[in-house]
Amino acid sequence: MGNQSFKTLSIDDFLQITGWPDFSKLIKKEHDKVLAVQLPGTFVNFSKPQNSLKNRYNEIPCWDHSRVILIPPSAKYNYDHTDPSHITLTPTEIPSTYIHANFVNGFKEKRKFICCQTPKKNTCEHFWRMVLEQESHIIVSLTKTDKGGFVCHEYWLNAEEGMEIFGRYVIRTLEIIKESSFTKTRLRLTDVCTDASREIHHFWYTDWPDVGNPISPVQILDLILQMNKKRKELTQAAGFKLGPIVVPAPKESVEQEYFVP
């Protein structure tokens, strides 16, 4: 490793060490050292009191240097959920640009992904605002949803012809396709205040264990291949580069680190 705290080993040296009786202890000791390294950067916006309820976990910061900055709304919009066309405008309390989400580079492509925490009940509107503002067309969810929103609030309706409304954003479910290990869904995202609308392709993988990695890496590889294929198709049809792929995960850690190439 390149850090002064760690010794760089050749392949032969490493293979020799694997035969030592205390090999596992050495690995754990080095792992603890890695975790103890203080990362450079600030997370001022994450720490602001007005943003605390938007964060799912206090111990996982949102770094300032790569965070997604929302465009602050000029007004707050309230809707009659039985009639999305019924709009009430009120002055916004505090224009907010914060969402727990960061740009992440892909292989040979800068800002290919946005890795974010799974939406909470009070951040679903911010989530869809981010998707629309960033010109994103693909979402890859790596976790199950739950009605209580403890892991991930249901930010779309998993039923054809279903509809969810979060603030000014209406999300309609157009089509659901069941694959062998994940579900593909076509959604229609609409901002009822500006009439901006976009079709969203949602990939949903729900077999990630609570601890560890997926049992079948082939399933994840298939998901990545289909995701990249769809993105290529959409890019060719649009004639311009699409926005980042949005990847929500509960703790923005294990799942995203494993998935994001």
Curated annotation (Swiss-Prot):
InterPro entries: Prot-tyrosine_phosphatase-like (IPR029021), Protein-Tyr_Phosphatase (IPR050348), PTP_cat (IPR000242). SMART domains: PTPc. SUPFAM superfamilies: (Phosphotyrosine protein) phosphatases II. GO terms for molecular function: protein tyrosine phosphatase activity. Disulfide bonds: none annotated. Residues 26-261 form the Tyrosine-protein phosphatase domain. Belongs to the protein-tyrosine phosphatase family. This is Tyrosine phosphatase-like protein H5.
